[in-house]
Amino acid sequence: MTMTDPVADMLTRLRNANSAHHDTVSMPHSKLKVHIAEILTTEGYISGWEVADARVGQTLTLSLKFGPNRERSIAGIKRVSKPGLRVYAKSTELPKVLGGLGVAILSTSSGLLTDRQAEKKGVGGEVLAYVW
């Protein structure tokens, strides 16, 4: 069975593993998911990621990040643009997550960018997710 929304599946797996205090979470690999993992690592929400060969295809494994007393580094994660309702933002109307404390992940003509990177480059695009 094919997956309708692989990004939503990734975010849901990440949210569930985070709330269950798992150290890692695995999912099917795709280039888009790797780019999202790179953004989450750069922004400090996860500690790292790796791609491994599985019996069928490749698997992306994310290493979750916790504080000294096992506090979650990801307080919340939300899928914004969905297959049934796409959400786009102009470069002048980029969303701010929690007044700039969180990050919005956008798919732009320059690749996947955070809201801050898109603002610097002056590009808009599809708002994939909010992470805070």
Swiss-Prot record:
One cellular component (GO) term of this entry: ribosome
Keyword rRNA-binding: yes
InterPro entries: Ribosomal_uS8 (IPR000630), Ribosomal_uS8_sf (IPR035987)
Superkingdom of origin: Bacteria
Organism: Leifsonia xyli subsp. xyli (strain CTCB07)
Taxonomic placement: Bacteria, Bacillati, Actinomycetota, Actinomycetes, Micrococcales
A Gene Ontology biological process term: translation
Protein name in the entry: Small ribosomal subunit protein uS8
Family: Belongs to the universal ribosomal protein uS8 family.
Signal peptide: none
Coiled coil residues, start to end: none
UniProt keywords, alphabetically: Ribonucleoprotein, Ribosomal protein, RNA-binding, rRNA-binding
Keyword Ribosomal protein carried by entry: yes
PANTHER family listed in its UniProt record: 40S RIBOSOMAL PROTEIN S15A
SUPFAM superfamilies attached to this UniProt entry: Ribosomal protein S8 (SSF56047)
Its biological purpose: One of the primary rRNA binding proteins, it binds directly to 16S rRNA central domain where it helps coordinate assembly of the platform of the 30S subunit.
An annotated Gene Ontology molecular function: rRNA binding
Subunit structure: Part of the 30S ribosomal subunit. Contacts proteins S5 and S12.
Gene label: rpsH
